[in-house]
């Protein structure tokens, strides 16, 4: 039965076969984790952002308007983006994860070219979008959506439509 569900997802969500673009960790202390990852693994530079208002123009939880905030730091390890997230406030997938598991790897991110089309496919596949947000690019583009896949796949999947341009980070570590 479970293999049938996975095959169904492969056919309905072909963008998942492109490979994992991002691994994300939910942590208690963003700054401390970034410094540790830089010292231990040589990962950096890290770009810091606070997601929520005013950066995000759209925020939803289970399809309804929501408000939440989190600090994130982004970097790369090879071709894979590493995202470190510190939950700040609101009802989020991060708070759910912390409550259920504590801190650790919370989701895998997959790139999509067209979020509207991807979300239509998600609906057709029978998956639930638990949290989404967007408008964080300088041109009002960029969107993310979390799918309830933990029970099925052992982790949450995030769909990511990157903005064409990024806002300048609040800070960079280490300073270049």
Language-model features and meaning:
Residues 1-2, 33-38, 82-86, 109, ...:
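Short acidic/polar alpha-helix capping motifs at helix-coil junctions
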Residues 1-13, 20-28, 72-80, 97-114, 116-176:
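Vicinal oxygen chelate
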Residues 5-60:
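Long, hydrophobic N-terminal alpha-helical segment
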Residues 13-14, 95-99:
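Short, flexible, glycine/charge-rich loop motifs used to bind or transfer phosphoryl groups or to couple energy/partner
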Residues 31-52, 99-103, 111-137, 169-170:
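Extended intrinsically disordered, low-complexity coil regions enriched in Ser, Thr, Gly, Ala
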Residues 44-96, 141-164:
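Conserved short beta-strand elements that form part of the metal-binding/catalytic scaffold
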Residues 53-54, 73-77, 103, 110-114, ...:
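Short, surface-exposed, polar/charged, turn-prone segments marking secondary-structure boundaries
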């Amino acid at each position: 039965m479970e293999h049938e569900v996975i095959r169904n997802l492969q056919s309905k969500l072909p963008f998942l076969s492109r490979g994992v673009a991002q691994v994300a960790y939910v942590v208690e202390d963003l700054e401390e984790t970034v410094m540790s990852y830089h010292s231990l693994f040589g990962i950096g530079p890290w770009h810091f952002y606070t997601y929520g208002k005013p950066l995000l123009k759209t925020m939803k939880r289970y399809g309804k308007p929501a408000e939440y905030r989190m600090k994130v730091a982004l970097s790369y390890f090879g071709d894979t983006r590493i995202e470190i997230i510190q939950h700040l406030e609101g009802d989020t997938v991060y708070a759910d994860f912390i409550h259920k598991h504590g801190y650790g790897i919370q989701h895998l991110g997959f790139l999509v070219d067209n979020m509207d089309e991807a979300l239509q496919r998600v609906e057709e596949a029978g998956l639930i979008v638990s949290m989404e947000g967007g408008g964080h690019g300088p041109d009002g583009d960029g969107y993310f959506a979390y799918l309830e896949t933990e029970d099925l796949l052992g982790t949450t999947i995030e769909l990511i439509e990157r903005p064409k341009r990024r806002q300048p980070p609040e800070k960079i570590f280490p300073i270049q």
